[in-house]
Amino acid sequence: MHVNGKVALVTGAAQGIGKAFAEALLLHGAKVALVDWNLEAGVKCKAALDEQFEPQKTLFVQCDVADQKQLRDTFRKVVDHFGRLDILVNNAGVNNEKNWEQTLQINLVSVISGTYLGLDYMSKQNGGEGGIIINMSSLAGLMPVAQQPVYCASKHGIIGFTRSAAMAANLMKSGVRLNVICPGFVDTPILESIEKEENMGQYIEYKDQIKAMMKFYGVLHPSTIANGLINLIEDDALNGAIMKITASKGIHFQDYDISPLLVKAPLTS
C-alpha cells in the first residue's frame, strides 16, 4: 500500500512513538487523525504539525481508548471527517503494574476493540476498500519480564490476537492486513513510569534492574520505530508479521513456524 493519499488513525498520537508515527505518515502524504486522551498534549501536537503540514491534513480527537463508547464515536468522527479509513495504528499504551486492570484494559482490550472497529470500516465485506492495522506490542511481548509481569502479559496478548486476527482476515478475504511492531526501549515519556511507585507498585524496588537493562540494550529514537511502521504499510506481502526493532539489530522479524495461510497474503488492491 502506498501511504500517499491515505487516511490514518493513530491512538496515543500526542507524544512519543505515536507523534513520530503521525509525522512519518504526514511526510508520506497521508491524512492523520490524532487520537489521545490528553487534551493539552493533543492540541499542542496538532499545532506543531500544523506548522509543518497543511492544517486540514490532521484532526485531533480527544478519546480515552479504554472507554468503548468514546472509541466507537472516535472512529465514526474520523470517517465522517475524512470520508474513509485506510490505516489504523493501535499505539496507546501504559505501564502500570499497580493498577493492573487498567493496564490490561488500555494495552490489550482497547487494541482488540480498535482492531474490530477498524475491520468494521475497512473490510471489503462491509463495503470498505481494505487497509492495514498495525498493533503496537514490545519485546516484552516475546519474553518474560520479572519486573513488569502485567505489562508483559498485555504485550504477549497483542501478538497472539493480531496473528490470529490476521489469519481470520485472510480467510474472510477482508482486504485488511494486520501486523505487529515490537520495539525495545524507546525514548518516550513511558520510560519515566519505572521511577514511580504509583506505576510500578511492588516492583519499584527493581527499578535499577530495568535501568541496567536499558543501558545494556540501548534506547531507540521514536523515528526509528516510525520507519518500521512505513515499511509494514508499504510491503503488501506482510500479514501477521511481528517486526522487532532493537538498537543492536535495527528492524528485523520474529520467525515462527506458521500456517501458509499467514504468509504472503495479497490482501489489498
Curated annotation (Swiss-Prot):
Expressed in proximal convoluted tubules of the kidney, where it colocalizes with the prostaglandin transporter SLC22A22 (at protein level). Expressed in lung, intestine, stomach and liver. Pfam families: adh_short. Keywords: Cytoplasm, Fatty acid metabolism, Lipid metabolism, NAD, Oxidoreductase, Prostaglandin metabolism, Tumor suppressor. Homodimer. This is 15-hydroxyprostaglandin dehydrogenase [NAD(+)]. It comes from the Eukaryota. SUPFAM superfamilies: NAD(P)-binding Rossmann-fold domains (SSF51735). The keyword DNA-binding does not apply. NAD(+) binds at residues 12-20, 36-37, 63-65, 91, 151-155, 186-188. Belongs to the short-chain dehydrogenases/reductases (SDR) family. One of its GO terms (molecular function) is identical protein binding. The active site is at Y151. It is found in: Cytoplasm. Its EC number is 1.1.1.141, 1.1.1.-, 1.1.1.232. It catalyses: prostaglandin E2 + NAD(+) = 15-oxoprostaglandin E2 + NADH + H(+); (15S)-hydroxy-(5Z,8Z,11Z,13E)-eicosatetraenoate + NAD(+) = 15-oxo-(5Z,8Z,11Z,13E)-eicosatetraenoate + NADH + H(+); (11R)-hydroxy-(5Z,8Z,12E,14Z)-eicosatetraenoate + NAD(+) = 11-oxo-(5Z,8Z,12E,14Z)-eicosatetraenoate + NADH + H(+); lipoxin A4 + NAD(+) = 15-oxo-(5S,6R)-dihydroxy-(7E,9E,11Z,13E)-eicosatetraenoate + NADH + H(+). It comes from Mus musculus (Mouse). Catalyzes the NAD-dependent dehydrogenation (oxidation) of a broad array of hydroxylated polyunsaturated fatty acids (mainly eicosanoids and docosanoids, including prostaglandins, lipoxins and resolvins), yielding their corresponding keto (oxo) metabolites. Decreases the levels of the pro-proliferative prostaglandins such as prostaglandin E2 (whose activity is increased in cancer because of an increase in the expression of cyclooxygenase 2) and generates oxo-fatty acid products that can profoundly influence cell function by abrogating pro-inflammatory cytokine expression. PROSITE patterns: ADH_SHORT. Gene3D superfamilies: NAD(P)-binding Rossmann-like Domain. The keyword NAD applies. GO terms for biological process: ductus arteriosus closure; female pregnancy; kidney development; negative regulation of cell cycle; ovulation; parturition; positive regulation of apoptotic process; positive regulation of vascular associated smooth muscle cell proliferation.
